[in-house]
Amino acid sequence: MRPVINYDELLKKIPYKFAIPIAAAKRAENLKEFAKPYVETWDNNYVSIALKELSEGYIRIKNEEILKVLIPNVK
């Protein structure tokens, strides 16, 4: 059974829409190189596991304060 990841909910936790796939891809690479997943799942898709870890808060984006510059200031 695939983990259900709601991207809109994930954007509420991490407001950097371009950083989420990069962080998930880096974590998926680590999982592919035999890192232990932080969540229990039957899925073997590394990207799905990485996104689930991000959504549950097991992993986070480093230097998040640098990314605050990327949030648009719309008036």
UniProtKB/Swiss-Prot annotation:
GO MF annotation: an example: DNA-directed RNA polymerase activity
InterPro entries reported for this sequence: DNA-dir_RNA_pol_omega, Pol_omega/Rpo6/RPB6, RPB6/omega-like_sf
Pfam short name (any one): RNA_pol_Rpb6
Disulfide bonds: none
GO biological process: DNA-templated transcription
Family note: Belongs to the RNA polymerase subunit omega family.
Self-association and partners: The RNAP catalytic core consists of 2 alpha, 1 beta, 1 beta' and 1 omega subunit. When a sigma factor is associated with the core the holoenzyme is formed, which can initiate transcription.
Name of this chain's protein: DNA-directed RNA polymerase subunit omega
Originating species: Thermosipho africanus (strain TCF52B)
